[in-house]
UniProtKB/Swiss-Prot annotation:
Region annotated Important for dimerization, chain positions: 242-277
Descriptive protein name: Oxygen-dependent coproporphyrinogen-III oxidase
Keywords in alphabetical order: Cytoplasm, Heme biosynthesis, Metal-binding, Oxidoreductase, Porphyrin biosynthesis
HAMAP family per the UniProt record, alphabetical: Coprogen_oxidas (MF_00333)
EC number, as in UniProt: 1.3.3.3
InterPro entries (UniProt xref): Coprogen_oxidase_aer (IPR001260), Coprogen_oxidase_aer_sf (IPR036406), Coprogen_oxidase_CS (IPR018375)
Species of origin: Chromohalobacter salexigens (strain ATCC BAA-138 / DSM 3043 / CIP 106854 / NCIMB 13768 / 1H11)
Binding-site residues, substrate: S94, N110, V111, R112, G260, G261, R262
Keyword Oxidoreductase: yes
Length: 307
């Protein structure tokens, strides 16, 4: 069966992976991404690119995957019973950057496409994706820049798109067991098929193409900020919360593991170092306390910037 939609999306995603790696490697200097191609026995494969022990990025990865099969994993079909009995293709690029300097935020993003088919029925398809920022020592102007790029990305598709997907991002990237957000949000969307295919695909491309514009200026502004053991310890502590979200709440991690995806690539998003301290709380009024007090609850960043 021909997959004209799938072929177009896959071509874009492979190109996006190349451009993301080139743009991020340009900030790093001597350390390069190494590529690891893999195949999935049940159908499909991918191309993982990882950077480690860099001067800027302590660890980072940009992963392309295309998996397919004759039946969906339980994590997908349980919530969507109409998908039962359908073959599927899932294709996407996901990326995460864990900088060495605690003043440079961690960043994550992905764009993906899913299609499920069966004989005699219309295909079921949708897009998903977004990007989100996780600072440890946040700077208001950085957060505003991040959200302004997100808003400008969404604007051609309707005035309601940024507020809706910004709110969805705040809700999705929440550690419910901690009652805090993972970071300062950005954009998140899933099950996007409310427009015709070409418009949905154009939106996905806009989101993927906007990431470097949103992130690289922040990296450049904060990379030279001095830090010491205290800041690195706090970074490791907050990275522990990042791990908690990925293993407890993230649907993409669950889908990847249940669908027989490649474990090394799925867990590529994990930070290189993390730590947990029993009942630790930052000193009131400290820069560390400011993160939770001011930044880990949803805010209307752009409205505040214009006030």
């Amino acid at each position: 069966m021909a997959h004209p939609h799938l072929d177009k999306v896959k071509e874009y995603l492979l190109d996006l992976q190349d451009r993301l790696c080139d743009g991020l490697a340009a900030e790093e200097g001597d350390t390069a991404f190494r590529e690891d191609s893999w195949t999935r026995e049940a159908g499909g494969g991918g191309r993982s690119r990882v950077i480690e022990n860099g001067e800027v990025f302590e660890k980072g990865g940009v992963n392309f995957s295309h998996v397919f099969g004759e039946r969906l994993p339980a994590s997908a079909s349980a919530a969507r019973p109409e998908l039962a009995g359908r073959s599927f293709h899932a294709v996407g690029v996901s990326w995460v950057l864990h900088p060495r300097n605690p003043h440079v935020p961690t960043a994550h993003g992905n764009v993906r496409f899913f299609i499920a088919e069966k004989e005699g029925a219309e295909p079921v398809w949708w897009f998903g994706g977004g990007f989100d920022l996780t600072p440890f020592y946040p700077v208001f102007e950085d957060v505003v820049h991040w959200h302004r790029v997100a808003q400008e990305t969404c604007a051609p598709f309707g005035d309601d798109v940024y507020p809706r997907f910004k709110r969805w991002c705040d809700e999705y990237f929440t550690l419910h067991h901690r009652d805090e957000t993972r970071g300062v949000g950005g954009l998140f969307f899933d099950d996007l098929n409310e427009w015709e295919f070409e418009r949905c695909f154009a939106f996905q491309r806009a989101v993927g193409d906007a990431f470097l514009e949103a992130y690289v200026p922040i990296v450049r502004r904060r990379q030279a900020t001095e830090y010491g053991e205290r800041e690195r310890d706090f970074q490791a502590f907050r990275r522990g919360r990042y791990v908690e979200f990925n293993l407890v709440w993230d649907r993409g991690t669950l889908f990847g593991l249940q669908s027989g995806g490649r474990t090394e690539s799925i867990l590529m998003s994990m930070p290189p170092l993390a730590q947990w301290q029993y009942c630790w709380t930052p000193e009131p009024g400290s820069p560390e306390a400011r993160l939770a007090d001011e930044f880990l609850t949803p805010r209307e960043w752009l409205e505040e910037a214009e006030a």
